[in-house]
């Protein structure tokens, strides 16, 4: 889940799929981060039934947003034909070179992913170590993905509006404020998958600096 990093276990997903099936609805499952970490061995959600739709892309887990490549899967043949018809009306086809690059990366995923997952683990560890020393923030450590969603403690004495103004204007550092996700701005999304280790470390220091001197 973005931004919390919560991972839905297979049993819970099966229960939701069963409920959806009984109501004649469809379940759309975003599996963009599926290939990272513990979820890599999970079957695609489409195996849960014909009314389950799975979507994913090469943008997140593989770090290739510039290719603009993704996919949609469903076992409902009639629905699949409707999706194909819609795609033809919107884009007709993707770039052949882009698709070839994406294909080659995906077919080599057993070679590419270990380095990516190791980098993600290092980023998560860096955030964990930083938060262990940052008493004004609290979090639930993400089980998957490449983002964390800590929040400023209610009793931390931090002026939230001033924090964001300083973080952006003075320190030129950006996080996703809570209102992006219909949450209080005491929450912030911090990404640890894309930045280099140096960039991430500097960004975390800047968050602490923008929070102000500890009380």
How would you name each of these model-derived features?
Residues 1-40:
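Active-site phosphate-binding strand-loop segment of PLP-dependent enzymes
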Residues 22-23, 134, 171:
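Helix C-cap/helix->beta junction micro-motif
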Residues 29, 92, 175-177:
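Hydrophobic residues in well-ordered beta-strands that form the structural core
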Residues 48-121, 128-130, 211:
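Conserved core segment of the aminotransferase class I/II
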Residues 103, 118-128, 139-152:
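Conserved glycine-rich beta-strand-loop-beta hairpin in the small C-terminal domain of fold type I
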Residues 136-139, 173-179:
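A short linear hydrophobic-aromatic micro-motif
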Residues 158, 166-174, 181-215:
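PLP-dependent enzyme catalytic core of the Aspartate aminotransferase-like
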